[in-house]
Amino acid sequence: MNIVVTGATSFLGAALCKELVSRGHQVYAVVRPGSSNRQVLEKLENDSHFHMIFRNLEELDQLDREISVECPVYFHFGWDGSGSENRKNPKVQGKNVLDGMKALEGARKLGCKRFLFSGSQAEYGICADTMGETRECHPVSEYGKAKIAFGGKATEKVRQWNQTGVCRMEYVHTRIFSVYGPGDHPWSLVNTCVDHFLQGEEMEFGACTQLWNFLYIEDLVKGLCALAFCERAVGAGTDPEESGIYNLAGEAD
């Protein structure tokens, strides 16, 4: 199957590309021109199943100029300011929503049947108990607000397309919780702890009053693939004919 992955050099995107290639799919990995993270994909560059496309996020509606085949599955992971101070920047996060809608339009042009977006647990806001897909969202960060805003706009656009016969597409909104594993930022909590412990050093923590959910990167990728290739991606809290919301997280006790 022909599959598009934006944000392909990210922690999640790179792992997904590797898994899809290993399964024999033709992967079109969208990378920003001059990306400093391109090296995370270097082991795939000589594989006949892997194709690197250089485009900025605001150009994602133009991928049909470089990809000449239909791509039934499209993963949109491209997002500015995911792990930086720009998570708080409304201008940066607002542009992500606009760029995401361009990605959706670009996917339509490529004959996409299932569009999968990397949402976040940040959409729920501050919660003291289990976060289920039907829980009302009260995002606090600009990052979380933008993720949920894009989900609403994309769901409505796909509904319009399906109702008017423009195309038939499913929009799948994944809410990804904390992920760890090879390729994660060296300053992440898990990596920092492991580095300290391996060197016999102590690690300073706060009061440790929060219960937090972590999922291994390989398990996340398997979950994403399950959503991409299942017969029908029906989720909770949305129109089952068109969309689905899925939490991707570790098992909850």
Per-region residue spans from a language model:
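NAD(P)H-binding glycine-rich loop region in Rossmannoid oxidoreductase-like domains
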Residues: F54-K95
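Glycine-rich Rossmann NAD(P)(H)-binding loop
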Residues: T6, S178-G183, E204-W212, A236-D253
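Conserved Rossmann-fold NAD(P)-dependent oxidoreductase catalytic core, especially the SDR/UDP-sugar
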Residues: Y74-H76, D80, M101-E142
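Short-chain dehydrogenase/reductase
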Residues: Q93, V140-G151, W187-S188, N213-F214
